[in-house]
C-alpha cells in the first residue's frame, strides 16, 4: 500500500505547485484570468469550441461550413485537439472555454509527473522517494512545458513519452513489444504532427 501512495506523491506535488502559481498570478480557478495566449488564443481555444459543437451535434466532423468556407474537421482534430482530455470540453459552457485552458494545462502537468514517476520507479529502483518526486516534478515543469503549453496537445507527448521509454526498455530487457506498440500508437493517434520525431527517436 505504501508503494501506491508513493506513486501519487509526484502528481500531487506537481498539482500543488501548479495551483500555487495559479494563485499567485490570480489565474482560474482563483480568479477569472486565463493562461491562454498566442497559438492557444488563435487556434486551440477556437478549435476546442469547434470540437464542442461537433460533440453536441451542432457541427459535422467531416464538413464544417463555418471554417475556411467549408472544410473537414477530421484533419484539424488529429492535429490540434485529439487529446482524450479535449473531450472534457463537452461539459464546459462555451463562455468558459478560455478558462478551461487552465484546467487542461493543469491536468496534463499532473499526468506528466505521474508517468515520469512511473518511469523513474521502474527504471531506477534505488531512487529514494524524494529523488523520484524531485525528478518527476522537474520533468513536468521543464522548459518544453513552460513554452509549449500554448499548444496544449503537445503536452500529451510529454506524458506519453515516459511510457514509450518503458516500452523500449521492455523490448531491450524482456523482448516484449506490446507496451511500446500501444504507447507509439497512442502518440501517433493523439498527435501525428510531432510523432515523426518520436518515431525517429
Regions found by a protein language model. Give the residues of each.
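Start-transfer (signal-anchor) and selected internal transmembrane alpha helices
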Residues: 1-27
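Positively charged n-region of N-terminal signal peptides that target proteins for export
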Residues: 1-6, 122, 173-175
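Membrane-interface coil-to-helix junctions
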Residues: 18-113, 137-158
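Structural signal for the C-terminal ends of transmembrane alpha-helices
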Residues: 24-26, 92, 120-124, 167-173
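Alpha-helical transmembrane segments with an aromatic anchor "belt"
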Residues: 100-103, 124-129
